[in-house]
C-alpha cells in the first residue's frame, strides 16, 4: 500500500476544509427566521381550528 499518497490526499483535504473562508451567518439566520414564522403560523392556525374541530366531534 502506498501510505504516502494517502497521507498527501488526507493532508490536502484537511487544508481545503480548514482554508475555506467562513460563510456569513445571515443566510442561515434568514432560514431560521422563516422556519420560526412557519411554526408560529401553524400554531396559530391549529389554535383557531381546534375549537371548531372539537365542536364538530361533540355534535357527531
Swiss-Prot record:
Q: Which Pfam families match?
A: Cecropin (PF00272)
**Which InterPro entries does the protein's record reference?**
Cecropin (IPR000875), Cecropin_insect (IPR020400)
Q: Which residues form the signal peptide?
A: 1-25
- What are the alphabetically sorted keywords of the record? Amidation, Antibiotic, Antimicrobial, Immunity, Innate immunity, Secreted, Signal
What residue ranges carry the coiled-coil annotation? none
Compartments where found: Secreted
Residue positions, PTM Leucine amide? 59
User: What top-level branch of life does the organism fall under?
Assistant: Eukaryota
Q: Biological process (GO) annotations?
A: antibacterial humoral response; defense response to Gram-negative bacterium; defense response to Gram-positive bacterium; innate immune response
Q: Does the keyword Secreted apply?
A: yes
Instruction: Kindly state one GO CC term assigned in the UniProt record.
Output: extracellular space
Q: What is its main location?
A: secreted
Q: Which family does it belong to?
A: Belongs to the cecropin family.
Q: What does this protein do?
A: Cecropins have lytic and antibacterial activity against several Gram-positive and Gram-negative bacteria.
According to UniProt, the name of this protein is: Cecropin-B
Amino acid at each position: 500500500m502506498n501510505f504516502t499518497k494517502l497521507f498527501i490526499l488526507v493532508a490536502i483535504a484537511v487544508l481545503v476544509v480548514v482554508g475555506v473562508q467562513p460563510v456569513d451567518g445571515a443566510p442561515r439566520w434568514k432560514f431560521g427566521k422563516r422556519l420560526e414564522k412557519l411554526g408560529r403560523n401553524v400554531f396559530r392556525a391549529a389554535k383557531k381550528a381546534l375549537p371548531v374541530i372539537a365542536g364538530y366531534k361533540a355534535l357527531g
